Swiss-Prot record:
Entry keyword set: Cytoplasm, Decarboxylase, Lyase, Porphyrin biosynthesis
Listed InterPro entries: UROD/MetE-like_sf (IPR038071), Uroporphyrinogen_deCO2ase_HemE (IPR006361), Uroporphyrinogen_deCOase (IPR000257)
Protein encoded by which gene: hemE
PROSITE patterns (UniProt xref): UROD_1 (PS00906), UROD_2 (PS00907)
Organism for this UniProt entry: Xanthomonas oryzae pv. oryzae (strain KACC10331 / KXO85)
Protein name in UniProt: Uroporphyrinogen decarboxylase
Amino acid sequence: MLKNDRLLRALNRQPVDRTPVWLMRQAGRYLPEYRATRARAGSFLSMAKNPDIACEVTLQPLQRFPLDAAILFSDILTIPDAMGLELYFVEGEGPKFRHPVRDAAAIHRLGVPDMETELRYVMDAVRVIRRELDGSVPLIGFSGSPWTLACYMIEGGGSKEYARIKAMAFNAPEVLHHLLGTVTDAVIAYLAAQRAAGAQALQVFDTWGGVLSPAMYHEFSLPYLTRIAHELERGEGAERTPLVLFGKGNGAYVADLAASGAEAVGVDWTISLADAAQRAGGRVALQGNLDPATLYGSPEAIRTEVGKTLDSYAQGNGGSREGHVLNLGHGMSPDMNPEHVGVLVEAVQRLSKR
């Protein structure tokens, strides 16, 4: 039995006593205890692939702040790593793959990894974290979106231009659709396995959906997100595991995402919550959408922005604050002040009381 089920209730658009709050990358380098754990573990991957260390890091922000959820400490690129692309990290450059897939032959060789063998470390981490949380708050599991994972798999790492994957979209769309189909199968299996291991809410990160034109988004990202929402078994009624579809730069597609079958849509700060709520039309909960840079502001500025965000959602939702989870519009940065996170969380709790 959960002691704090605000997140799950809000994602399912049920009444809550205040707006729940959690933060993307709430377990991260801005915390000195995280940096100490990373120094001890030796690398990011060493932490992510050790269930006990992943649990330790997941719980660190909850030991500091009264957040309404824990999110699994992992990476969106675990699926392609398990497919054989071999993930590694370069300091200052981010994630890379030793074996990117750039032609039809390489793409057709890919298969869906076995979740309890190649990705057992993720499921073990979920199980350990659930045990340690002991019902205090829900645990969120997650995956990258098919389009975002395909970007990394084809580019071989992060990119500014996405030239290789966009060239494939124009020159060999059937090959790209084959890749996206295989990755979607894997994402559905991955999220289902996390749910079976104990994840109580699930989020898909479509980090790079916003680099697509509207026509390409509707061809190469949205259909696969919709397939996940339709095919991922999440239970029924009050016990249903809510699914959040988050995307950077997805404001123009809120109405499409609200029709996808997911329980919630996560938006960034490039659309007002009032506008997003009007587009959603009460079909889904909304999550967001403070600009992470707000945390560089003074405590008073942070409180002001929290108030504006809460009010903006209510303005677009017929005056009601139900069906909203307050979050950032993207992840936290390493140079942010932990004390400012405390200010943000306290402001949400105080200003959103029903």
